[in-house]
Amino acid sequence: MQKIILHRAVAAPTGAAGTDRSFSGTTIKLGLDIHQACYVVAAQEDHATPKPARRFAPAEFVPWVGTLLARGHQVFVVYEACGFGFGLCRRLQAAGATCYVIAPRKLDEARKGVKTDALDAGVLCQRLSRYVEGNRKELAVIRVPSEEEERARHVHRQREALVRARTKLQAQGRGLLLTHGQPAPARWWRKQGWAALEARLPGWLCVRLEVFRPVLAVLDAQIAALTAELEKAAAPDLPSGLGKLTQVVISREVCDWQRFQNRRQVSSYTGLCPGEYSSGGKRVPGAVTKHGNPRLRCALVELAWRLVRFQPQYPPVAKRLAVLGQGARATGAARKKAIVAVARQLAVDLWRWQTGQCMAEKLGFQP
């Protein structure tokens, strides 16, 4: 098993082995396996074999990288996207290092069934080395949003979390009503629905439901406030069916439409491209990859269904209207394939529209 060397403090530039003086190469590549309590770091100088992994306290790592940069080393860092966000990447870039955040993936390339933090850091370090040397397929690099973009995303993501919480409490209340043979309206906690229910419910059941009502009322108010804030930020003169809320969610999840070079990159980011199994002369398309942004994918499918109602002349919808127009009467598989195809083409058309390649009317959208 690979030995882990503990690095407990950041030494001064004149320190002994284990500090920046232990490196003699011009280029240093660092693979990070990040945890809340520590960072496990594997380092490689130039083209040499990676050194044994070290552990750093989170507060020690960036200053240590700073000492390497101060000595004239060129430092490259890579770590997988995780729940700790992009703050570390921004701090490293501000210090002068080149930092890449990549999509998570299985790092046990040999499939030995052995997983340690040191091994993961070592694999990341070696992949980074090959990437820096020119093999761009070694890392799936993620675009790091700016702090402003990340703050803007939190608004609709917080609203999404509140909607989920409200749906859960609403369902619990309805379940309690149905369990005891009572009518269960969808908005049972609101003033009008509650007045009708309270008159016919037994007292003990009203007491149980009253526990939910204040929480649901607060959630209603918070969701309404966030919805108004988001709709206020929407672009003016949107085509019919493209709601203000959906437009803001899609724009903020993408952040920058200009980063896509072609329609293939757009489709890949949505995760709505079909998988494929091909060998010899056989080609078998599979289910969509779902590789990409799940919130964007959900918003696109929701918007695609609205276009079936409000923009039936939109070319991707018109092409599949025979299936989509049947609604629930169509088979589940046919409806799903059709709406996914519409959502995929819709993402490409939104990219063309937002990057100024063509007008919305030319794409088939009606005002």
PLM feature spans:
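Phosphate-backbone recognition surface of nucleic-acid-processing proteins
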Residues: 237-240, 244, 249-331, 335
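Glycine-rich, often acidic, oxyanion-interacting loops/wings at catalytic, nucleic-acid
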Residues: 154-236
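Short alpha-helix plus adjacent loop in nuclease-associated cores
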Residues: 100-141, 282-291
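A short, charged helix-loop
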Residues: 125-154, 192-203
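Short helix-capping/linker segments at secondary-structure and domain boundaries
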Residues: 131-136, 169-170, 255-259, 305-315, ...
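Glycine/alanine-rich phosphate-binding loops at beta-alpha junctions
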Residues: 1-99
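Low-complexity, acidic/Ser/Thr- and charged residue-rich accessory regions of DNA metabolism proteins
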Residues: 281, 321-367
